[in-house]
Amino acid sequence: MKRIITLVLALILALTLCACVTPKTPMPIEDGDKFAAQPVTVRLGGLKGPTSMGMVKLFDDADNGLGQNAYTYTIAASANELTPQLVQGELDVLAVPANVAAILYNQTEGGVVLLAAGTLGVLYIVEKGGETVTDIASLNGKTIYATGKGATPEYALTYLLSQHGLTLGEDVQVEWKSEPTEIVALMAEQDNAVAMLPQPFVTVAQSQVEGLRVALDMSAEWDALDNGSRLVTSVLVARKAFADEHPAALAAFLEDYAASTDYANEYPAEATVLVEKYGIVKAAVAEKALPQCNLVCITGVDMKVAVGGYLQTLYDLKTEAVGGAMPGDGFYWMGA
């Protein structure tokens, strides 16, 4: 009996010693743990104008490693240069005209989502050589230089004209140009001219074209109609696949973007230095233009109301303006 007890105790002691031995080979790390600490890189796209002016602090913070995410960014003169990159998965977030966001949503069958409204109205009618333009009705019989065919500028102008009994292409002609700088050069050469320009290019034109005046604020004209919608110039969209995979990173981006927009509005002198640094416009121009750029970061329910009302107005005017159908609820990203 004593022998049996001794053998049992010896066996227990041996098992205990084996359990306490540290294995020489470390335990494998699960793939999820290995990548959990890796920062998400958000690839951004913006335009040379108010959309990127609101993001310059975010760009600068990213360059200095201060953002909540890692960011890369591309700034272009036209949305047409960047929308293919978003669709092809080369960009994750892009600033585009509001109606283009709806078109992309329809064309990709829900492949993009709306994150925020980034700028409200930044469009103005400017006139050189007279004071003949006093209201929308006074545009009758005139030819206007403009950019933005097939986007917010064209549809905003079409809608405002229609509300005053005028038809674009019949009562009012437009010569569409690819970039605002072309229009500024044309107006400098002519004695009398009318154009529709966005900020900050209105300020650029005023610095280069003698006798140029701001005749109409298109946002004020829109608001005067009291139709329940707002003139939303640009918005931020993201690939739905990215939003589904990285909702927390997207929410962090919106926090960084809101802070960047606030910085531009609250510290214009400092922000304009960054606007020039990132090649958008010169600081002196940006300083005058910023207060008229209506930089915002409207998200959630407020975004849905503001952008949805604007898109409905465009849809009622011309269904093709929003891609043939009003976007459904899935279009609006309501947060992580």
Task: Give residue spans per PLM region.
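Positively charged n-region of N-terminal signal peptides that target proteins for export
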Residues: 1-11
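C-terminal motif of bacterial Sec signal peptides marking the signal peptidase cleavage site
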Residues: 16-19
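Short, glycine-/small- and polar/acidic-enriched structural segments
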Residues: 25-167, 174-176, 193, 199, ...
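Solvent-exposed, polar/charged alpha-helical surfaces in well-ordered, non-transmembrane soluble domains
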Residues: 53-61, 80, 84, 88, ...
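Short, solvent-exposed loop/beta-turn-alpha elements that line the ligand-binding surface or hinge
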Residues: 62-69, 220-229, 295-304
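Pocket-lining segment of extracytoplasmic ligand-binding domains
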Residues: 99-100, 181-274
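Secondary-structure end/capping motifs
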Residues: 243-317
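Conserved C-terminal helix/tail region of periplasmic/extracytoplasmic solute-binding proteins
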Residues: 308-336
